[in-house]
């Protein structure tokens, strides 16, 4: 029987961690069985799973109130005992209670993923409570997986996670799917399309992108924003306030982003915090030049030949605007930078490389866990 993997997400709405899981599950096919918990009950990303993926969604209702910590830990222990997974995989801060529960009782070998930070830690300052919780929870039995060198450094220097327990695995992508969709790219009515793809959340700081775009009124350029989220209404209000409603389009939620990238001429990333954003890899695969804030590993992801023309300090809106302006004015420049980005992502960020790396990590953790599992009687007592 295929090994049983239990995945715990704060949400299974489509985002970077969910997109990566879908890629891996589809690539693994029937090699693993998956049980998935979305703590908020949202499971929209499940529609992207292939038919040969054996996956079930489990319900878990976190307890709220004064007795929450003890009640939740007991409920987690009970579910882990019932499911008896060969490997527990927990994703980001929202699943940290599960890592804590498994830390002390060792129901299953575990790999914990950290993909980045929300707006409360976007400025690089770590919240002390979270630092200590991560040290305690991840620092025991769990292996830690991070997609960026920046996070690997934080894990060692701030969270004090042992180097041998920290695994840096860059995200990978189906390059040809995006390259093929973009092969027929052509200008729309002679104009240039700047685009971005992201969840409309505060840390994405799309207000910055809109303000920078507003300085390009003298050029034949439009802006397309693909994605949805809580910031949409404030952003639409900002667009109207700046008198840009006829030049900025909100595309809403997108299931298949490849055709969307094919309609862009330039990709823009205006985030306050990222680590290794999938959107940048997708834009590179689509052969796009990129203007981005210098967050996470973005400066190492892009073609080294054009980093200086692509990345600006986070708060440098004038610099961001100027790099957009230069690319809008230069069709040959866009083509050269986009081609270099596409070649670089092919060489360094293939899906095949990522899948192979994760398969080896999963198998190693499962094999190690066979010798270190909590005895069934103790598991029942804990639950």
Model-derived features with residue positions:
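Carbohydrate-associated surface elements
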Residues: 150, 172
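A conserved nucleotide-sugar
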Residues: 31-34, 206, 210-250
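A conserved mid-protein helix/loop that constitutes part of the nucleotide-sugar donor-binding site
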Residues: 15-23, 192, 196-215, 230-237, ...
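Short His-centered aromatic/hydrophobic patch
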Residues: 90-96, 114
């Amino acid at each position: 029987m295929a090994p049983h993997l239990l995945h715990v997400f704060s949400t299974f709405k489509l985002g970077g961690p969910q997109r990566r899981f879908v890629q891996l599950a589809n690539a693994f096919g029937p090699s693993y069985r998956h049980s998935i918990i979305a703590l908020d009950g949202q499971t929209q990303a499940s529609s992207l799973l292939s038919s040969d993926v054996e996956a079930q969604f489990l319900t878990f209702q976190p307890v709220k109130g004064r007795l929450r910590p003890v009640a939740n830990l007991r409920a987690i222990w009970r579910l882990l005992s019932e499911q008896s997974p060969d490997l527990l995989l927990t994703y980001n801060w929202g699943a940290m209670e599960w890592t804590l529960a498994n830390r002390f009782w060792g129901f299953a070998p575990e790999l914990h993923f950290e993909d980045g930070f929300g707006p409360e830690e976007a400025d690089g300052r770590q919240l002390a409570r979270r630092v200590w919780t991560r040290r305690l929870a991840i620092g025991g039995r769990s292996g830690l997986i991070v997609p960026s060198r920046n996070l690997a450094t934080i894990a060692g220097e701030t969270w004090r996670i042992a180097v041998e327990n920290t695994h840096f695995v860059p995200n990978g992508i189906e390059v040809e799917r995006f390259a093929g969709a973009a092969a027929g790219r052509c200008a729309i009515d002679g104009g240039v399309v700047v685009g971005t793809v992201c969840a409309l959340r505060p840390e994405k700081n799309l207000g910055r992108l809109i303000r920078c775009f507003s300085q390009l009124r003298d050029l034949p350029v439009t802006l397309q924003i693909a994605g949805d989220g809580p910031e949409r209404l404030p952003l639409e209000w900002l667009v109207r306030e700046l008198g840009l409603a006829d030049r900025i389009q909100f595309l809403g939620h997108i299931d298949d982003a490849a055709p969307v990238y094919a309609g862009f001429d330039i990709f823009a990333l205006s985030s306050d915090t990222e680590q290794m954003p999938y959107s940048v890899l997708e834009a590179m695969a689509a052969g796009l030049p990129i203007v981005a804030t210098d967050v996470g590993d973005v400066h190492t992801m892009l073609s080294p030949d054009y980093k200086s023309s692509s990345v600006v300090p986070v708060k440098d809106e004038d610099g961001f605007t100027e790099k957009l302006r230069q690319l809008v004015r230069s069709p040959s420049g866009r083509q050269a930078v986009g081609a270099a980005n596409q070649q670089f992502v092919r060489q360094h960020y293939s899906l095949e490389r990522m899948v192979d790396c994760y398969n080896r990590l999963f198998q190693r953790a499962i094999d190690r866990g066979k010798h270190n599992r909590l005895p069934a009687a103790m598991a029942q007592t804990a639950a």
